[in-house]
Structures are given as C-alpha cells and as structure tokens.
C-alpha cells in the first residue's frame, strides 16, 4: 500500500471511530476504569481485566494481583456506564438496574516470575536496575506518525475521531438532546501523491430518540458536527455524506450488539493506516508490553516526525516474555526521510530506551491515566495530556542524526 499511496495521483483511504456508548468501547472503558482504581491503590498492581456486555448484563473477568485496598468493582462498573450516558431503560441499558457479574482471580505465578525478575537478572547479565523488569508477554508492537495533521496522525482517523468527540459533546451539552450514546463515524480521504487533498465520504450513524425524523438528524449532524470538525477546504460539492443510512437507529448499545474489551484495536490506534501487532490495550497494566511498548513506539515515531527526520514513519519492536531487552527494532520511513533509515534507527537507539522498565519510568505509566484513553483513540489526542504524545526528544534526535 505504501508505494501505491505515495506514488498515486488519486488514492482513497478510509478509517472509522466509535463513540463511548458503543458496546465494545463501553467494555474498554469499564476495564480501564477498574485498572485505574487498582493503580490508585497500588501503582505496581498487575491487572488484566476483560469486560463483556449484552442486554442488561455486564461481566468482568480477568487476573489481578495487588498489595492493598478494597476495590468496589461493581460500583466502578455502574458509575462508568452512568458517565457514558446509559441512565434509562429507554436507551436500552440502565446503569442502575443492569446485572453485574465479577470473576477475577490472581495472576499466574508462572507469568509473575518472569516480570518480577527478568532473564537478565536471573543469569547475572543485568546492565542496570531497569533490566530487573521483564516483558509481560512476547509479541510485536508498532508505532506510527505522519505529517498529515497537526497531531501527526493520519487524516482519516483524526477526522473520524473529531466527529465522534463532537457528537458526544453536542449530546451531553444539550445541543442535540435527542441523541443517545451509541454512535460510529467513518471518513474516506482522497490523497494525491501521499498528501490529503479532500474528504470524499463522511458517514455518521448515531443512536437517537424514536420521535426524531431522519431529515432533522441529517440537517443537525451536518450543521453541528460535520461542518465544525472537517476543514471547509476539504469539503466540496462531490463529498458524499451518509447519516444513519439504515433510516433508523433507536435500538443501540448492548441491547443492539454485545460488546467485548479489545475489539476496536484499529480505532484505538491508526485507523488501519499502520500495522498492528494484535494486542489490545484496555484493562492491562503497563507491565504488559502490548500496551506500554505500543505507547512507546508512538512516542518515538511522533518525535521522529516532529524532528524533521521523516514525514512518515512506522516502527516495530518485539519482545520475549520475561526478557527485558527488545529482540528487534525496525524503522520504515516510506521514502520520506531526510537521512537514511539506518541513521534514524541508530539515533532512536541512542535517544530512547525501549526496555519495559525504562518505558514505564520514562512515560510514568504506573498512574491512573487509562480510562480517558479508552474512548476517542489512544494516539493523537489534543483534548488530554498523554506522555507518549509529547515531542520532548526532538533536539536529542536531531543531534544524534547529525542535523
């Protein structure tokens, strides 16, 4: 795709986003709200919490090990659902009356022994104290950044997220009180030689009260959502707009579809523009490299683009469970780099430390900061301060690359 994308005079790419009331996103937020509660009591808690939901029911399951404090899980679940907006049976789900089942047990000691004491520590090969912490699992993680938007994200996913955030704002502030929590957006961007030039298609599906006409919903969402979030220069007479194309979206949330933590990993990351290692984020403490290393790779990628080393970059890092040092690190700049890729890779290795313990330290990840990432995307956020979105290694990278 990269060569076609960069060399084609006309190329289309589509990304989607979903609202906080989407059943899968509900589950992500519940899992991360529970994670935050455990980290508030014990910053070194080991947490792997999954959530499932269907009509009238939420199930929380997983593995947790922590030192102290009572965690009122059912209360956290109901509060999270209420904050999302499911406060009445009219919406198909009610935070106060839904069933909540909890099935949580301790982390496997076989896993814990590899995280508590890395292989480097066991064989006496530690370079420093950071190598006492092993990766919580094997796997590969990716990070990406590009210069298409101010937040250094692909235009299609950035716009899809903006539409959803605006949709949630007008629902909650009373501008469009008939809207309900479940919604999805989708944006197709037209590119010319790797640069976004216009929006070809906008799709929004939003749950709504039963007495609102399709014509009113369409007019309101175009005026209060689409026109406020998509640059005017990118909309033209040929832009196609679809609003609730089925004609009706009254039944939504868990009543319309079951939900599960970790089923929106492309929404959470780069909208399909970059590759994905397959591991979900929500409900996992930072010892799980599925989450922490993906955050670190985004941090590295964003600093590379901000430093002017490349206009577009993707990184891959890989780990073995119980081993501190990454197994591999690669950089791909798709022909957009100011210096050779091997120079960028060398600079990254000089400036960034991608061992799990160092990632946790440098990004200060043992804090209750995760619930707010669980809807609206984990990357490119301009509404919240996330450590992996900071471009605080730009000058170091430029020096290391000889610029």
UniProtKB/Swiss-Prot annotation:
<dbReference type="GO" id="GO:0000287">
    <property type="term" value="F:magnesium ion binding"/>
</dbReference>
<dbReference type="GO" id="GO:0004478">
    <property type="term" value="F:methionine adenosyltransferase activity"/>
</dbReference>
<feature type="region of interest" description="Flexible loop">
    <location>
        <begin position="107"/>
        <end position="117"/>
    </location>
</feature>
<feature type="binding site">
    <location>
        <position position="257"/>
    </location>
    <ligand>
        <name>ATP</name>
    </ligand>
</feature>
<feature type="binding site">
    <location>
        <position position="24"/>
    </location>
    <ligand>
        <name>Mg(2+)</name>
    </ligand>
</feature>
<dbReference type="InterPro" id="IPR022631">
    <property type="entry name" value="ADOMET_SYNTHASE_CS"/>
</dbReference>
<feature type="binding site">
    <location>
        <position position="50"/>
    </location>
    <ligand>
        <name>K(+)</name>
    </ligand>
</feature>
<keyword id="KW-0067">ATP-binding</keyword>
<feature type="binding site" description="in other chain">
    <location>
        <begin position="248"/>
        <end position="249"/>
    </location>
    <ligand>
        <name>ATP</name>
    </ligand>
</feature>
<keyword id="KW-0460">Magnesium</keyword>
<dbReference type="GO" id="GO:0006556">
    <property type="term" value="P:S-adenosylmethionine biosynthetic process"/>
</dbReference>
<feature type="binding site" description="in other chain">
    <location>
        <position position="22"/>
    </location>
    <ligand>
        <name>ATP</name>
    </ligand>
</feature>
<keyword id="KW-0963">Cytoplasm</keyword>
<dbReference type="InterPro" id="IPR022630">
    <property type="entry name" value="S-AdoMet_synt_C"/>
</dbReference>
<keyword id="KW-0547">Nucleotide-binding</keyword>
<dbReference type="InterPro" id="IPR022629">
    <property type="entry name" value="S-AdoMet_synt_central"/>
</dbReference>
<comment type="subunit">
    <text>Homotetramer; dimer of dimers.</text>
</comment>
<feature type="binding site" description="in other chain">
    <location>
        <begin position="263"/>
        <end position="264"/>
    </location>
    <ligand>
        <name>ATP</name>
    </ligand>
</feature>
<feature type="binding site" description="in other chain">
    <location>
        <begin position="182"/>
        <end position="184"/>
    </location>
    <ligand>
        <name>ATP</name>
    </ligand>
</feature>
<dbReference type="InterPro" id="IPR022636">
    <property type="entry name" value="S-AdoMet_synthetase_sfam"/>
</dbReference>
<keyword id="KW-0479">Metal-binding</keyword>
<dbReference type="GO" id="GO:0005524">
    <property type="term" value="F:ATP binding"/>
</dbReference>
<dbReference type="Pfam" id="PF00438">
    <property type="entry name" value="S-AdoMet_synt_N"/>
</dbReference>
<dbReference type="GO" id="GO:0006730">
    <property type="term" value="P:one-carbon metabolic process"/>
</dbReference>
<dbReference type="InterPro" id="IPR002133">
    <property type="entry name" value="S-AdoMet_synthetase"/>
</dbReference>
<keyword id="KW-0554">One-carbon metabolism</keyword>
<feature type="binding site">
    <location>
        <position position="257"/>
    </location>
    <ligand>
        <name>L-methionine</name>
    </ligand>
</feature>
<feature type="binding site" description="in other chain">
    <location>
        <position position="288"/>
    </location>
    <ligand>
        <name>L-methionine</name>
    </ligand>
</feature>
<feature type="binding site" description="in other chain">
    <location>
        <position position="107"/>
    </location>
    <ligand>
        <name>L-methionine</name>
    </ligand>
</feature>
<keyword id="KW-0630">Potassium</keyword>
<keyword id="KW-0808">Transferase</keyword>
<dbReference type="InterPro" id="IPR022628">
    <property type="entry name" value="S-AdoMet_synt_N"/>
</dbReference>
<feature type="binding site">
    <location>
        <position position="280"/>
    </location>
    <ligand>
        <name>ATP</name>
    </ligand>
</feature>
<feature type="binding site" description="in other chain">
    <location>
        <position position="63"/>
    </location>
    <ligand>
        <name>L-methionine</name>
    </ligand>
</feature>
<comment type="pathway">
    <text>Amino-acid biosynthesis; S-adenosyl-L-methionine biosynthesis; S-adenosyl-L-methionine from L-methionine: step 1/1.</text>
</comment>
<protein>
    <recommendedName>
        <fullName>S-adenosylmethionine synthase</fullName>
        <ecNumber>2.5.1.6</ecNumber>
    </recommendedName>
</protein>
<comment type="function">
    <text>Catalyzes the formation of S-adenosylmethionine (AdoMet) from methionine and ATP. The overall synthetic reaction is composed of two sequential steps, AdoMet formation and the subsequent tripolyphosphate hydrolysis which occurs prior to release of AdoMet from the enzyme.</text>
</comment>
<comment type="similarity">
    <text>Belongs to the AdoMet synthase family.</text>
</comment>
<dbReference type="GO" id="GO:0005829">
    <property type="term" value="C:cytosol"/>
</dbReference>
<dbReference type="Pfam" id="PF02772">
    <property type="entry name" value="S-AdoMet_synt_M"/>
</dbReference>
<feature type="binding site">
    <location>
        <position position="284"/>
    </location>
    <ligand>
        <name>ATP</name>
    </ligand>
</feature>
<dbReference type="Pfam" id="PF02773">
    <property type="entry name" value="S-AdoMet_synt_C"/>
</dbReference>
